[in-house]
Amino acid sequence: MRIFLVGMMGSGKSTIGKRISEVLDLQFIDMDEEIERREGRSVRRIFEEDGEEYFRLKEKELLKELVERDNVVVATGGGVVVDPENRELLKKEKTLFLYAPPEVLMERVTTENRPLLSEGKERIREIWEKRKQFYAEFRRIDTSRLNEWETTALVVLEALDEKEISTIEKPHLVKIILGGFKRVRNEELVFTTERVEKIYGRYLPENRLLFPDGEEVKTLEHVSRAYYELIRMDFPRGKTIAGVGGGALTDFTGFVASTFKRGVGLSFYPTTLLAQVDASVGGKNAIDFAGVKNVVGTFRMPDYVIIDPTVTLSMDEGRFEEGVVEAFKMTILSGRGVELFDEPEKIEKRNLRVLSEMVKISVEEKARIVMEDPYDMGLRHALNLGHTLGHVYEMLEGVPHGIAVAWGIEKETMYLYRKGIVPKETMRWIVEKVKQIVPIPVPSVDVEKARNLILNDKKILKGSRVRLPYVKEIGKIEFLEVDPLELLEVVD
């Protein structure tokens, strides 16, 4: 694979190129820096000593070399597109134009080692006017409203050809496809969020409804609005609503689709890692009511789910780690892919090979569990690993769900080790990996408040016991009924 990035100075070619190299295991080459290395002097000195014409000659020679190389992502110089021969070479490659308006570029750039700006940043407008017709010959990505990870995700998605990773037929169809998100443009109606539209709007069909991000969408008010819109459209039972977003949005979409006209078609395109490895698979749909999370819901399997790990690249830090926690949970439940967590730097840099394998293992394990227990009566309780104490941390500390579950996994495992149930080696390995993913120390909590939360947990069985899932050995899940108040010994 070869990816070339073109654009004005300050458009982010080098920054985004470096991220892409880590995501796709490609070599990163900055053409200006490579010319400097070969010449043994800065671009500014080359301009001063030999002139711009000499520099452009060296630039053209280098470009001809690079289009013959494999597995590279290249940040071109801003003026490479002026030469028509260069443009013809670049048109034969996966070339993306990173756009930002001149006023944004002026905020981003410094004049250091930029000979064309020796007279000041205002020259950017003049340079843009001369070059914009050439940039327009390439696929454009507007970076002005996107952060670095959002831009990276969009460039990678544009550059990738479809590659199928896995197909799961039961309990419902799930396809894991790199580049598969682009199929969403063929959907009849999409429910999505403003953030998803901001990043991926170019792929969404015109027929779409926007809803809030996160748990805010899971209310009767938004359900009513969706019903009114569907009635206004005269939406028939034979058509499909596609939920495009995170877990809250897919929960909401599933609830609406399963109740409107007693059920219309339903598909998901999950855009967060947590939704890909958990919420979009298994047929649980719900909204919140009277302050209680997921208290009104349905069991309704989607007709199909398209999972593209590429779109998780755009996630905010923190939210991304929440998804990694869920994937870690599924990995230790299945016993597959534990070696992925021996590459923490690859996970941190969102390497797509590692992410794709994590998603594949997680979805396959979730599908296996749901097949055996579709209505959450037994084995599916294994998915509650870390959730008993995780619920306590989520409520008392106000942290995101994924972080709370990570702390819950750590503390519940330590409790079971102290009881002589989980072996020391297993406990140490799990705790080490959890701390690696979420390096935030587990806080002490008010024991009395924790006690009240535990006693009111919906997972409490008759006789005030809780069925606690645990990993005795990696890949071996077991259950133990315990007095939930005993768990308090590890939370203070």
Curated annotation (Swiss-Prot):
What terms describe the molecular function in GO for this protein? 3-dehydroquinate synthase activity; ATP binding; magnesium ion binding; shikimate kinase activity
Keyword Metal-binding assigned = yes
Q: Does the keyword Plastid apply?
A: no
Chain positions recorded as substrate binding sites: D32, R56, G78, R131
Q: Record's superkingdom?
A: Bacteria
Copy out the cofactor comment: Binds 1 Mg(2+) ion per subunit.
Where does the protein end up? Answer: Cytoplasm
Q: What is its EC number?
A: 2.7.1.71, 4.2.3.4
Record-stated family: In the N-terminal section; belongs to the shikimate kinase family. In the C-terminal section; belongs to the sugar phosphate cyclases superfamily. Dehydroquinate synthase family.
The protein here is known as: Bifunctional shikimate kinase/3-dehydroquinate synthase
Gene that codes for this? Answer: aroKB
